[in-house]
Design a protein with these regions (language model features):
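Conserved metal-binding segment of the jelly-roll/cupin
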Residues: 25-45, 56, 161-182
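Double-stranded beta-helix
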Residues: 48-94, 150, 188-211
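Short, well-ordered, mixed-charge alpha-helical segments that flank or form enzyme active sites
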Residues: 41-42, 59-63, 110-113
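A cross-kingdom feature marking solvent-exposed beta-strand/loop segments within repeated
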Residues: 15-29
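Generic beta-strand structural signal
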Residues: 30-32, 38-40, 47-51, 99-102, ...
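A short glycine-rich, His/Asp/Glu-containing loop-to-beta-strand
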Residues: 82-133
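Short, structured patches in soluble enzyme cores that scaffold and shape functional sites
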Residues: 36, 44-46, 53-57, 90, ...
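Glycine- and acidic-residue-biased ligand/ion/polar-headgroup-sensing regions
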Residues: 1-18, 108, 120-166, 172, ...
């Protein structure tokens, strides 16, 4: 649940008034996991109701489950002007077949997904292949951020200005984000791949930043 509340049914399970925050910038999210092959119903139960449907191909999945906001423990990643807050929603510690979901809050003027990393090669335990999307929201509607998407050989080399509600697909390569000064940034990451592990490779040019 991005914001507001909804009644949700997945298979034979149902939950009322799922959702506990007025916006993505206030608090942690409630979420519901629904496996493949079972019906999913969502009905708004508040005037404001914003829902993100995050899905990936799967054959079996796991049992339907409510993942309450109280179970999402915020933590910091980075420091100084790379500090951001992470809300892990459906990562490796929760059952699913291929889906990984997390959200990140980046203060105005800070960099995120930084130092730049990638996960486009199946080379476990160094790196896993994961497709990914970024769903961006800005704390003010006129706000913006900049997302880079590039590869080592620069066969892909894009700088994208993103606004409130924009989605960026990461087909491959490194993908750092910068929040414009004055505009706090939220993004929802949805990832999936043949191996459900988040293992990344940092851009060698910037690996020294981790020392």
């Amino acid at each position: 649940m991005l914001a507001g509340q909804a009644d949700i049914a997945a298979g034979s399970h149902s939950w009322g008034n799922v959702g506990s925050r007025p916006s993505v910038f206030e608090g942690t999210p409630d979420a519901v996991y629904a496996p493949p092959g079972q019906p999913l119903e969502i009905a708004a139960s508040s005037e404001l109701c914003e829902v993100a449907l995050c899905w990936a191909p799967a054959d079996r999945g796991a049992e339907p489950a409510l993942m309450p906001a109280s179970g999402v423990k915020p933590f910091k990643r980075g420091s100084g002007n790379t500090e951001r807050t992470i809300h892990n929603i459906l990562m490796e510690d929760r059952p699913a077949e291929s889906l990984l979901v997390t959200e990140v809050l980046t203060p105005a003027g800070n960099w995120s997904s930084y130092p730049p990393h990638k996960h486009d090669t199946d080379d476990e335990p160094r790196e896993t292949y994961l497709e990914e999307t970024y769903y961006h929201r800005t704390a003010r509607p006129e706000g913006f951020a900049v997302q880079l998407v590039y590869t080592d050989d620069r066969s892909l080399d894009e700088a994208i200005q993103v606004g409130d509600g924009d989605v960026v697909l990461i087909p491959r390569g490194y993908h750092p984000v910068a929040a414009a000064p004055g505009y706090d940034l939220y993004y929802l990451n949805v990832m999936a791949g043949p191996r459900r592990r988040w293992l990344v490779t940092t851009d060698p040019d910037h690996r020294w930043l981790l020392d």
